[in-house]
Amino acid sequence: EYLDYTNGDDQVNTAIEGGSAPDLIMEGPERLVANWGAKGVMAPLNDLWTDDAKKDIYESVNSACHNDKGDYYEYPLCMTAHCMAVNMTKVKEVGADKYLDTDKHTWSTEGFLNTVDALYKGGYENVAAIYCGGQGGDQGTRAIINNMYGGTFTDDAHTKYTADSAENIKAIQTLYDTDGINFDASIAGGDEITLFRNGTLQMAFCWNIAQQLNADNNDAGLTNDGDEIMPMAFPTASGDPKLCGGIWGFGVFDNGDEAKVKAAKTFIEFIAADPDQVRDSVLASTYFPVRASVGDIYADNAIMSEYTKFMAYLGDYYQITPGWATARTEWWNMLQRVGTGEDVATSVATFVQNANAAAAAEA
């Protein structure tokens, strides 16, 4: 059964409470490890994580798939990196393409702000939106704010939220003060994508390879009107972007049936670890391999091959921090308050207080 993000959590939680959880599920560490694993309803997969697997699977992925005691509740298959995008046709039109490294897909914070300014002065009143109508696409607003001046969303140990740092406050204030960037409580990430595609916005903070490949209204890599879409890492002052990632893999619910747990593990080994199968499994996902040994599986696909460059920019997978569900809600509420003119330091202090209270309650 395919579950969507509208009510999938409720369906699984209802099944768990009713004693009818599925034997096998494909999801990310924020659910398999930090949620269901922490609640004790998942079977440990430590035996699948052999020394060879640990050497082959990227360390950033490995570290997200186990808890602080070293118990693995996810065996990963594929991953992607979330990024942003710009209307490159319009950027060139206003002479701002000099601020973008289109080979590495990187730019500086100063270059980003100069690009926004050039577009705004070029007649594009709505360059970008800090969307905050809900949690949809919130990885984009977190990433633009964290990257601009080197802030973080959590501490390295994933025990508390750190959005009240001076770096984050500076970034939020800068975005609020910048002409052409508007805090918009009427839209979430999906709405922003629509507005970017139809030309209302000239930048999108909610982007990934699925969006770059989308051909619903025009060819892949083009807006509805045929403008070129350039995917970009988020701007940084350091030149070292840290992108939010998505990791997908398998978890096994412990339903008290050893035979079913064993069968589920056998399935996982075949789909996600068998040298003759794993490449095809990743290709079927349309995402990217978590194993170095799989190599460049998209060499014959120009868009996918180019997007592979973003994998090198993957940052910390902090979504496994306790209190995550509360933190996500508090985040867009905080952005809404900033958008109505509340002092930034006050807004983020409220966010951190509420998010860390939830983290402490779940720790």
What residue ranges belong to the model's regions?
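Extracytoplasmic/periplasmic solute-binding protein
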Residues: D68-L77, H82, S108-K160, L201
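Extracytoplasmic "Venus flytrap"/periplasmic binding protein-like
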Residues: E1-I57, D71, K92-Y99, L195, ...
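Short, solvent-exposed loop/beta-turn-alpha elements that line the ligand-binding surface or hinge
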Residues: N46-Y58, K98-H105, A128-Y131, G151-K170, ...
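Hinge/lid segment of periplasmic solute-binding proteins
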Residues: G28-C83, G226-P235, I297-A302
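Conserved C-terminal helix/tail region of periplasmic/extracytoplasmic solute-binding proteins
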Residues: D276-V278, F288-V290, G295, K309-A363
